[in-house]
Amino acid sequence: MYKRQEVVGTDYNKELVATLNAGKTTFKEDGLDELFNDAVKAGIKFTTEYQKTDMYIVSVPTPYDKFSKKVDACYVVVAIKEVMKICPKGATVVVESTVSPGTMDNFVRPVVEENGFKIGEDLHLVHAPERIIPGNMVYELLHNNRTIGADSKEIGEKVKQYYVSFCQGEIVVTDIRSAEMTKVVENTFRAVNIAFANELARICRHDNMDIYEIIKICNMHPRVNLSLIHISEPTRLALIS
């Protein structure tokens, strides 16, 4: 099922790189240590220097700016600039970071072209948004469905073959803007449902109603599927449908 790939992890944090090269992880997740140990035995390496390869996967933070109410893609742009300093002609850059729709067109493409690269020939751009949640990262990495957005079906299918080597979920190939939008829609849908759950819980508490009983009854409707996925305290509920 798993096709072996040669992998090199890159990070500017020298202490982190040293820790990983020593065979140690820096946080705990179910199944992570076992997976990491297997990767170490298979030859994974970590460095602060970008390497020459045919494919780069960029997974960096995209913080939310509460003042502009926009996602800041500066770390993505910086990472791609570093890649362009070393990558061979025809390399593919896959951005896994969550970005706003239009980020690849409005921020990434201009930078690539300004550096003299012809997109689709010198460098291929792909967006394959991650779909994992802390606490269940390993399972979701292996089993969640994935979306790959590319400028051409050929490149999309090429990248898909890399993901098939570890992802057991369905992998859909589409265009980049659609891939950007699907991740934002997924996150927004979840956020809206959490907000709805909190409001529903507030109303139920105010009127001394049992929210669990209400959800149970509502779920008897063929087009309703409400699920309590997390209760951190009596005043907060997380709900998805």
Which stretches of residues belong to each language-model region?
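Single conserved hydrophobic/aromatic residue that forms the stacking wall/gate
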Residues: 1-2, 229-241
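Conserved N-terminal Rossmann-fold NAD(P) cofactor-binding segment
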Residues: 6, 10-55, 59-70, 111-115
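Redox-cofactor binding/interface segments in oxidoreductases and associated redox assembly factors
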Residues: 56-58, 95, 149
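Short glycine-/small-residue-rich Rossmann-like dinucleotide-binding loops
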Residues: 60-62, 98, 152
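Rossmann-like NAD(P)(H) cofactor-binding subdomain of soluble oxidoreductases
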Residues: 64-131
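Internal alpha-helical scaffold of NAD(P)-dependent oxidoreductase catalytic cores
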Residues: 110-128, 132-226
